[in-house]
Amino acid sequence: MKKNILLLLIVFFSIAACKKDEPIYEINQLQSNSYNANKNKLKSASQYISILYANLFQKALSPNELVEITRCIESVGDKGLVHEVVLSNFMNKEGVIIPSDSLMRADLDLFIEETYKRFYVRDITEAEREYFLNFFASHPDVSSEMVYMAFSLSNEYQFY
C-alpha cells in the first residue's frame, strides 16, 4: 500500500513537473524621453530677443538694440503681450527672412521640417508632421508669416 501511494505520488509529481517551457522574449530596455524633455529653463528677456532676431533675420542683433528691447520687456509686467509687440515690430521690419506662401505650399513637408529646426532646434515627430499637414490642408488661408509668429510665441520656444 505504501509502495502504491509512493508510486502514485512520484507519477503525479513527475507529470506536474513536466510542463512545456514558455518562450521568453528578450526586450531591449529603452529610455524614452519627451521630444522637449530637456527644455526646462526659461529664456531670459535678452536671450529670447537675440534668438528671435537671429531666427527671423538670420543675423545677430546689435548690442544697443538688444539692451533697448530688453529694458522695454523688463519694464512691462505682461511678458506674453510684450513678446507679441516685439515680434510684431520685428515682422514689420525690412529683411525678415520668411519663405513665401507659394513656396511654403509647394513643399509643406520641407517647410514644416525647416521651421521646427529653425525655431525649436529639434526634429519634428511624425505625430506633429501629420497634424500640421492636416492643418494646412484644412486651412488654406494660413500664411508662412502666421506660422512663424505662432512658433515664436509658443511655450516650447520660451524654454531652452
Regions found by a protein language model. Give the residues of each.
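Sec-dependent N-terminal signal peptides
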Residues: 6-9
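Positively charged n-region of N-terminal signal peptides that target proteins for export
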Residues: 1-4
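Intrinsic disorder/low-structure terminal segments
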Residues: 11-12, 147
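C-terminal motif of bacterial Sec signal peptides marking the signal peptidase cleavage site
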Residues: 14-17
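Substrate/cofactor-recognition hotspot
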Residues: 19-160
